[in-house]
Amino acid sequence: MSNESQVSEAPVNFGANLGYVLDLYDIYLDNPSAVPEDLQVLFSTIKNGEANIATNTEGQSNVTKGDSTIKRVMRLIDNIRQYGHLLADIYPVNRPQRENVPKLNMEDFNLDQETLESISAGIVSEHFKDIYDNAYEAIVRMEKRYKGPIAFEYTHINNNRERVWLKRRIETPYKATLNDNQKIELFKNLAHVEGFEKYLHKNFVGAKRFSIEGVDTLVPMLQQTLRIASDEGIQNIQIGMAHRGRLNVLTHVLEKPYEMMISEFMHIDPMKFLPEDGSLQLTSGWTGDVKYHLGGVKTTQSYGSEQRISLANNPSHLEIVAPVVLGKTRANQDTTDKPGAVTTEFKKSMPILIHGDAAYPGQGINFEAMNLGNLEGYSTGGSLHIITNNRIGFTTEPEDGRSTTYSSDVAKGYDVPIMHVNADNVEATIEAIEIAMAFRKEFNKDVVIDLVGYRRYGHNEMDEPSITNPLQYYEIRKHESVDILYGKQLVNENIISENQMNQIFDDVQNTLRAAHDKIDKNDKMDNPDMQKPDSLAEPIQTKDEEVSYEQLKEINDAMLSYPSDFNVLKKLNKVLEKRREPFESEDGLVDWAQAEQLAFATITQNGRPIRLTGQDSERGTFSHRHAVLHDPDTGAQYVPLHNVPDQKATFEVRNSPLSEAAVVGFEYGYNIQNKSCMTIWEAQYGDFSNMAQMIFDNFLFSSRAKWGERSGLTLFLPHSFEGQGPEHSSARLERFLQLAGENNSTIVNLSSSSNYFHLLRAQAANLGTQSMRPLVVMSPKSLLRNKTVADPISKFTSGKFEPILPEAHDKASVKKVILASGKMFIDLKEYLTKNPNKSILLVAVERLYPFPADEIDALLSELPNLEHVAWVQEEPKNQGAWSFVYPYLKELTTDKYDLSYHGRIQRSAPAEGDGEIHKLVQNMIIEQSTNIN
């Protein structure tokens, strides 16, 4: 057996990074003259088989007396790279005690200075041989680097090119990029960051502000990020963060004036101090929100070329804003105002996500959001993650809050580099940003920086942390703030004098005091306007521009025309060819899927882009949509909606990962950034949508009232009771109706394909306007192919969306009106078709919110012999629409007609688990509700 085969089969197991020397050794085995002469000598000492390099179960290198010197050196080098972070100087206070740290010293490997001085520095890294005289100097440098104020973790990364890039960037001697003037400017920025907090602490005692103190360097890190982004031509920055440090970021990154911030603490209208040049955009709703949830948008040239910096509005639900920011970023990167497919340019925008050390590993939304990072439909070219690590979560310390060494460890599964940096080492934090931004630019991947600091006060400024964390806070209270530490450093470096340092501190306080003095203390907000805007006074406008028969036929023909070299699966082709029938026969009907396709096509013809995502949305959960066709012979894909005649905007459909919260958050963010785009999320089954309940509750339905943030996101939630059990029946309609108020949404449960067509077009027409709002569709399952739902093409070329659809009736004969929606209406219609009764008028309530009370009232008033009104639903009485519609129906029927409910009784689970029992219950509901007596 040759040396080469022995080495290639050896159990070399140093983690992901084996070190540059092992690569050279492989080259040496193949061609000794291809490596430097000094290494040829060293490699020649390795006997056959001795290159079997392994590690023990603790991850520490096995060292035996018989090991060659070169192998021991390589083990030492590899251990420093892989485990040096465990001994790094990254803790400003309360350094944790490490146990079972792998061997990281020369002595552990039977090495000494003299031995290492006799070895070339090239054994450590190729470029070291031109920098250092020998391996000893190189290893000393490595130890300082890997055990310094930045701790590096990258050996877990699978991609060799990324590992090599990081290794060389880290190990190349760092040349300071900060000159004296830049250091002074950095110090002044820190003085403002810390001085702002101290001023608020002194003048607004006990007021909640969630101070940044302890991780103050976050602000200069962000400022440096913006400078680098500007140099790279990135003009749009999207930032997401929670409440900790938010006021400081608003003030010193987005340049919100001190007067505005102080006004908010005084409960005085801050908008009086909004810059008149329009550079700062702050929106608010009619109910408002606490100051540390609010965001803003700043257009500035402070960091180089003109940039638009956005800080996303955020609820108290930690980390949930992350996918929203990713969606906003992707919307900025996508070009959608052209026909066909979307094009994405990462350089247009970048996301910065600021996390908390307790929340980052604690909240599952981070796993979901990071999983989006390299997916074609969701990637943003790499997020910069900064963990503001104050090493405590409210009162919970790390050992009770996570099962890992670092709060950042969850990111390792996503193959991204991690840097831990001492928040008190100002210049190290700047270097960490520079490395992160360079890596992102090179590889378009996420990077995580763990900014390790502390929290100066309790969770909020009214909290006393010594009650639960006395030892930690004993040390923190003795610890000087970073602005003082850095100021003293500059004094010691003779860059500034002590008097200059103190003068800068005084200047900051004087600036804040002057801003405070501008505010009239008596100018209180006594009568705040909490009325919703006039644009929400009415339901969404549903007037539809008519579409000609010729236009729809041209679209339909185009959808059924394929490239000459593309084959459609024969079985599927038969299904699709049936879509010609509505245009070829009077008996032809347009089903749900075809109605949707025609609506989408006309919407893009009108210049509205469409983005549809969800699990299995390309085909459709129920194999109905077929928006992406697959050639059975070649696997090639074809999207018919990229072939729409006279198309003016893009169509995009994506299968999403198996996630609800992050994907819905992403689509919400996409929509609020590109308000003209018809952004749609489709649940695989509506039952699973409650995995995204936080997005519905805290963003979609309340964002406009809280923050003035308009959304027109559309939800498709398959919903109907069909004997498939309690987890495949209900989209929890009742929860969406509970969230409905102040005309904040449109919620429908439809029974007509043409009404669906008109609704989608109406929703699209309102996008980008002040009247836009979310649309929630309880979409069908079995009804997708039900001919009762399908309509002739004539209903598509005229009309508009109708909130109620009464069946044909003789007004004088009607004694009972049955109101129902969705599949319940269709079941009743099919029953009454077989068992006609002129005394009963069946009415489809297509729009549940805003409830069509006026339309129903007008209908009832036309029925002279009406005695009874019944609401019929599939869902249990405590679920579905009944609790919501009852007050409206009670008001309409009081002193006029009897009112009754028909449906399942109150249940804790939505539906029966047995299909036969389901049929019995469903039939009972139908028979009881249609009994005229």
Swiss-Prot record:
Q: Which GO terms describe its cellular component?
A: cytosol; oxoglutarate dehydrogenase complex
Q: Name one Pfam family in it.
A: Transket_pyr
**What is its cofactor?**
thiamine diphosphate
Q: Coiled-coil segments, which residues?
A: none
Keywords assigned by UniProt, alphabetized = Glycolysis, Oxidoreductase, Thiamine pyrophosphate
Top-level enzyme category:
oxidoreductase
Cross-referenced Gene3D superfamilies: 3.40.50.12470, 3.40.50.970, Multifunctional 2-oxoglutarate metabolism enzyme, C-terminal domain, TPP helical domain
Q: What are this entry's molecular-function GO terms? A: oxoglutarate dehydrogenase (succinyl-transferring) activity; thiamine pyrophosphate binding
Q: Which InterPro entries match?
A: 2oxoglutarate_DH_E1, 2oxoglutarate_DH_E1_bac, DH_E1, KGD_C_sf, ODO-1/KGD_C, THDP-binding, Transketolase-like_Pyr-bd
Q: SUPFAM superfamilies, from UniProt?
A: Thiamin diphosphate-binding fold (THDP-binding)
Q: Name the catalysed reactions.
A: N(6)-[(R)-lipoyl]-L-lysyl-[protein] + 2-oxoglutarate + H(+) = N(6)-[(R)-S(8)-succinyldihydrolipoyl]-L-lysyl-[protein] + CO2
Q: Report quaternary structure and partners.
A: Homodimer. Part of the 2-oxoglutarate dehydrogenase (OGDH) complex composed of E1 (2-oxoglutarate dehydrogenase), E2 (dihydrolipoamide succinyltransferase) and E3 (dihydrolipoamide dehydrogenase); the complex contains multiple copies of the three enzymatic components (E1, E2 and E3).
This chain's function reads: E1 component of the 2-oxoglutarate dehydrogenase (OGDH) complex which catalyzes the decarboxylation of 2-oxoglutarate, the first step in the conversion of 2-oxoglutarate to succinyl-CoA and CO(2).
Family the UniProt entry places it in: Belongs to the alpha-ketoglutarate dehydrogenase family.
State the name under which the record lists this protein: 2-oxoglutarate dehydrogenase E1 component
Species whose genome carries this gene: Staphylococcus saprophyticus subsp. saprophyticus (strain ATCC 15305 / DSM 20229 / NCIMB 8711 / NCTC 7292 / S-41)
Lineage start: Bacteria, Bacillati, Bacillota, Bacilli, Bacillales
